[in-house]
Amino acid sequence: MPRLARRIYGIENEYGITCTQRGQRRLSPDEVARYLFRRVVSWGRSSNVFLENGARLYLDVGSHPEYATPECDSLSDLVAHDKAGERILESLAHSAEAKMREEGIRGDVFLLKNNTDSAGNSYGCHENYLTVRVDDLTRLVEVLIPFLVSRQIIAGAGKVLLTSRGPLYAVSQRAEHIWEGVSSATTRSRPIINTRDEPHADAERYRRLHVIVGDSNMSQWATYLKVGAMAIVLRLLEEEVVLRDLTLENPIRAIREIAHDTELERTVRLVNGRELTGLEIQEAYFERAERYHERIGLPADEARALDMWREALKALRANDHEALFGKVDWVTKLTLIEAFRARHQLPLSHPQVSLLDLQYHDISRERGLFARLEAKGRVPRIVDDETIERAVDEPPATTRAALRGRFIRAAKEAHRDYTVDWVHLKLNDQAQRTVMLKDPFASEDERVDRLLTSI
């Protein structure tokens, strides 16, 4: 399998939305979403827009605001742009509250970067990886599914789950809602890997791998590790490194088994009859990656992710949750919940515990539990506030997003009507001039320069 010198990454996060006044629900999610997107519609004439930083912001099915980062070719850029999405939506929430007040509606708009609501509906965090096109996806899928099923132990967001057998704390939010290993649908069957073939690039050379099994992360550290570890495994596949056969007998049962065991001791069965824990599966991938790094070397981004992967697995092996506080979301939230329960003598099923679970994911920097930990310096960061604020306005400089951002900015300043998507830039004038950008790595293009000059 040929390899990529650079890789393109992107993350799409859907957000939960609600509006309450003194704890009571004030507006339906649909009504809140309309207020939230009023500012967007006023300048974009649509609730589906591309922004000057190259990202896409739109209202998804079920009144979920969704932010898709621009194309990033570094993990730290990706973290910055993922966090920029939170800032952009937080700003829209403030505008929505102000507009509601003008119309005599008092209420707080909550945007939650989580994956399930109180009614049991699930919404996603989708990761995108550019890969080299191969004719047969079988090998790719065989290797990736056990990795992704077990990756929740380092990247899960955690959740209090109320089941018929009583409450439990689950490692992953999405695990309950995944029904297939591989599928071309995202909502109906909720697979681990979505195979719908939309590369948003030269289809003869590239494929866009669409992973929909992951949780949304509050922790920058977890986002970096989640995507970084996946990038390393893709590199091993591209380099045709021999990997142990870890094919799971039943991936869907396995993902739930691993999710329901915070001690990480429960085993899952492989096709070859062996039984391994999720931690052992992750360690098997990590050991192969470490050997590759010692022999050949990983790029700096991935080498940093490898160090973080080692740190996470070592702490989980030692059951050292303190070492992962502020880094791994499910561990951080569980630590907060256990302390809260002990202080107030509350059962796991208590509504106050469920409320704390939600508050962890509130993107408001005033209210959000994780945000408050960050403000107190209790959380390690990959990027600082200045970098995030820059990402709110500016696209990554080294990918196609730079061209899209320049075009949008120029067209808006000149009050020109335009249409853009991931691949096309179009001026809606008599000439209907369109530029098609098939290379996601190209941040300069003479055709775009000419289009900008004509504006």
Swiss-Prot record:
Coiled coil spans: none
Enzyme Commission designation: 6.3.1.19
GO molecular function: ATP binding; ligase activity, forming carbon-nitrogen bonds; magnesium ion binding; ubiquitin-like protein transferase activity
Pfam assignment, any one: Pup_ligase
Residues reported in the UniProt entry to bind ATP: R56, T69, W422
Residues the record marks as active site: D60 (proton acceptor)
Pathway where it operates: Protein degradation; proteasomal Pup-dependent pathway; Protein modification; protein pupylation
Enzyme class: ligase
Catalytic activity field: ATP + [prokaryotic ubiquitin-like protein]-L-glutamate + [protein]-L-lysine = ADP + phosphate + N(6)-([prokaryotic ubiquitin-like protein]-gamma-L-glutamyl)-[protein]-L-lysine
GO biological process: modification-dependent protein catabolic process; proteasomal protein catabolic process; protein pupylation
Function text: Catalyzes the covalent attachment of the prokaryotic ubiquitin-like protein modifier Pup to the proteasomal substrate proteins, thereby targeting them for proteasomal degradation. This tagging system is termed pupylation. The ligation reaction involves the side-chain carboxylate of the C-terminal glutamate of Pup and the side-chain amino group of a substrate lysine.
Further remark: The reaction mechanism probably proceeds via the activation of Pup by phosphorylation of its C-terminal glutamate, which is then subject to nucleophilic attack by the substrate lysine, resulting in an isopeptide bond and the release of phosphate as a good leaving group.
The protein, known as: Pup--protein ligase
Gene source species: Acidimicrobium ferrooxidans (strain DSM 10331 / JCM 15462 / NBRC 103882 / ICP)
Organism phylogeny: Bacteria, Bacillati, Actinomycetota, Acidimicrobiia, Acidimicrobiales
Gene designation per UniProt: pafA
